[in-house]
Amino acid sequence: MRPLKPGAPLPALFLLALALSPHGAHGRPRGRRGARVTDKEPKPLLFLPAAGAGRTPSGSRSAEIFPRDSNLKDKFIKHFTGPVTFSPECSKHFHRLYYNTRECSTPAYYKRCARLLTRLAVSPLCSQT
């Protein structure tokens, strides 16, 4: 490093600015006291919506984007499984699976539900005559 000139004001100004700055401005607060100081300070908002932007409430918007179809579940599962029939002995297991599981009640899992239903249809329990 080069030696500084005797009359250089830059390091003195830097040290003065560093000494006068708030405690939390140097990086992470140290200890509990620093954490309490930063919690009391108002936090700036990162996003402020524009006034009159014409946004709709999220509930009505989701209803417009995803219209409910009562046969949507049946359409998806019939598309994935194909023609699947269940014997009368197996109807209890079918109803338990179709109406009471997450796979058959959540649209994200309909493909898994279709796989479970086809495995149930070809299982030895349901294929007995």
Swiss-Prot record:
Cited InterPro entries: ALKL1/2
Key word Disulfide bond present: yes
Cellular compartment(s): Secreted; Cell membrane
Record PANTHER family: ALK AND LTK LIGAND 1, ALK AND LTK LIGAND 2-RELATED
Keywords, ordered alphabetically: Cell membrane, Cytokine, Disulfide bond, Membrane, Secreted, Signal
Family membership: Belongs to the ALKAL family.
Tissue specificity as recorded in UniProt: Widely expressed with highest levels in thyroid and moderate levels in stomach, trachea, small intestine, prostate and brain.
Disulphide bridges, residue numbers: C90-C126, C104-C113
Biased composition (Basic residues): 25-35
Signal keyword on record: yes
Organism: Homo sapiens
Pfam families per the UniProt record, alphabetical: ALKL1_2 (PF15129)
GO biological process, one term: positive regulation of ERK1 and ERK2 cascade
Signal peptide: 1-27
Entry's Gene Ontology cellular component terms: extracellular region; extracellular space; plasma membrane
Any one GO molecular-function label of the UniProt entry: cytokine activity
Protein name: ALK and LTK ligand 1
Region (Disordered): 24-63
Protein role: Cytokine that acts as a physiological ligand for receptor tyrosine kinase LTK, leading to its activation. Monomeric ALKAL1 binds to LTK, leading to LTK homodimerization and activation. In contrast to ALKAL2, does not act as a potent physiological ligand for ALK.
